[in-house]
């Protein structure tokens, strides 16, 4: 039996929030792993420590920039798969990655910077709508150019939402009162960052995910806001005072509040008022579900996640 070699993977945005998990999992999964970084990143104290960790995993560092076509092309020619995890300010710059992939002609799969909600099914308000529209534009461009792809939809990052249960500015889950977005009934989906990386790396060489959207929908983690609050109340043996933030209240804050808060609340409106995270069926012609493809992966449930906070 011939064992196929694991693909060589380039991660662009590898020192970012979700990127670092993908770099670690890629390297530990046996993929020859490359990370495109700017030389200026080496002098950033926080990032330089992360880069030392990457080196300890055997990761190859390639100096370059998403806006420097020459460095991008040189990096892409060395690998089989390109994964982009760039942040919102660089979503549009992924056009450069697409151009370089087309010119290089050797890429078996491109995973653009998705790792959130399915923008083809979301009904977001501004300022989130513009960010989602950029992702949609990149998707259509990839498809038009005939580049092999996988779009990774992980919904909420568990570590982003669950530690404070969506309570702005808080560091731990509430123990007295909780603010709930909308009526708290629409379902949303939460996935631990390490699990996101595990499912993603299983998908990169899987023919079943080629030219498909990979949806992460761990059954135990499809919960409404009210269900998460109830779960937390059971853990601490206490009933919390509940304050419901109406759609009208959310829209007012989105219009009047400071910028980072406006984006986050606009996304919360999409997820918790519209239910855009889980209110549609996955179409087999365009999408697959991670826990069905990889049933042996033991994912962290929301229930387990909260044990460390009790």
From Swiss-Prot:
Keywords for this protein: Alkaloid metabolism, Cytoplasm, NADP, Oxidoreductase
Report the top EC class in one word.
oxidoreductase
The EC number on file is: 1.3.1.-
Free-text tissue specificity from the UniProt record? Expressed in roots.
Induction, as annotated: Induced by methyl jasmonate in roots.
Q: What biological-process terms (Gene Ontology) are attached?
A: alkaloid metabolic process; nicotine biosynthetic process; secondary metabolite biosynthetic process
What subcellular compartments does it reside in?
Cytoplasm
Listed Pfam families: NmrA
Q: Which InterPro entries match?
A: NAD(P)-bd_dom_sf, NmrA-like, NmrA-type/Isoflavone_red_sf, PCBER-like
- Respond yes or no to whether keyword 4Fe-4S is given for this record: no
* GO CC field: cytoplasm
Keyword flag Oxidoreductase = yes
Q: List, in alphabetical order, the Gene Ontology terms for molecular function in this entry.
A: oxidoreductase activity
Q: Which domain of life is it from?
A: Eukaryota
> Which annotated residues bind NADP(+)?
13-19, 38, 47, 139
Pathway assigned in UniProt? Alkaloid biosynthesis; nicotine biosynthesis
Task: List, from the UniProt record, the residues annotated as the active site of this protein.
Answer: 135
General function of this protein: Involved in the biosynthesis of pyridine alkaloid natural products, leading mainly to the production of anabasine, anatabine, nicotine and nornicotine, effective deterrents against herbivores with antiparasitic and pesticide properties (neurotoxins); nornicotine serves as the precursor in the synthesis of the carcinogen compound N'-nitrosonornicotine (NNN). Reductase that may be involved in a late step of tobacco alkaloid biosynthesis. Maybe involved in either the formation of a nicotinic acid-derived precursor or the final condensation reaction of tobacco alkaloids.
Quaternary organization? Monomer.
Member of which family?
Answer: Belongs to the NmrA-type oxidoreductase family. Isoflavone reductase subfamily.
Miscellaneous comment as given in the Swiss-Prot or TrEMBL entry? Root cells silencing A622L exhibit inhibition of cell growth, severely decreased formation of several alkaloids, and accumulation of nicotinic acid beta-N-glucoside and N-methylpyrrolinium cation.
Give the protein's recorded name. Isoflavone reductase homolog A622-like
Task: Specify the species.
Answer: Nicotiana tabacum (Common tobacco)
Give the taxonomic lineage as stored in the record.
Answer: Eukaryota, Viridiplantae, Streptophyta, Embryophyta, Tracheophyta
